[in-house]
């Protein structure tokens, strides 16, 4: 019987990647980001360990959705008080807090446990093209969200 490979915490290399979300489709972009955060793109992937990389997303305000989702997709949050449900459309939330759209999409694709919360801290989302992580020298991660597109 083969023994499962288990990397030590010190042996795990964590890279920094920057992703440009301009004109990218939300769901397909979030899927790829979650895969990199989880570490599934590495041969050292282990399901119960954090083997993933850091991801910086820029131009979050320019992410797109297909069809009529801009006006029909709803984001809900609750204050915890009676009658405290707030409902917002994609278009309105994109104007107000575009970072939250990508954060919620990626968070829903991560495990719902302590490991998922730890992985989520490695996601950094910014509205514009600038980010404060130049010191980490992030590599550009190109994600193609439509077959045949050069996005």
UniProtKB/Swiss-Prot annotation:
Keyword Ribonucleoprotein recorded = yes
Q: What is this protein called?
A: Large ribosomal subunit protein uL13
Q: Which organism is it from?
A: Synechococcus elongatus (strain ATCC 33912 / PCC 7942 / FACHB-805) (Anacystis nidulans R2)
PANTHER family documented for this protein: LARGE RIBOSOMAL SUBUNIT PROTEIN UL13M, RIBOSOMAL PROTEIN L13
Q: What does this protein do?
A: This protein is one of the early assembly proteins of the 50S ribosomal subunit, although it is not seen to bind rRNA by itself. It is important during the early stages of 50S assembly.
Q: Which UniProt keywords apply?
A: Ribonucleoprotein, Ribosomal protein
SUPFAM superfamilies attached to this UniProt entry: Ribosomal protein L13
Ribonucleoprotein: is it a keyword of this entry? yes
For this record, an example GO cellular component is: cytosolic large ribosomal subunit
PROSITE patterns with a match to the protein in the record: RIBOSOMAL_L13
């Amino acid at each position: 019987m083969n023994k499962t490979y288990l990397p030590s915490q010190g042996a795990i290399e964590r890279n920094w990647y920057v992703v440009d979300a301009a004109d990218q489709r939300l769901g397909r972009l979030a899927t790829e980001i979650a895969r990199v955060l989880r570490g599934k793109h590495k041969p050292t992937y282990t399901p119960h360990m954090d083997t993933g990389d850091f991801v910086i997303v820029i131009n979050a305000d320019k992410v797109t959705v297909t069809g009529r989702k801009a006006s029909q997709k709803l984001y809900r949050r609750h204050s915890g008080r009676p009658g405290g449900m707030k409902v917002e459309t994609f278009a309105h939330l994109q104007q107000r807090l575009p970072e939250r759209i990508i954060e919620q999409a990626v968070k829903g694709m991560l495990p719902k446990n302590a490991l998922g919360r730890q992985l989520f801290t490695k996601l950094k989302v910014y509205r514009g093209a600038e980010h404060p992580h130049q010191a980490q020298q992030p590599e550009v991660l190109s994600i193609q969200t439509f077959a045949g597109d050069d996005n």
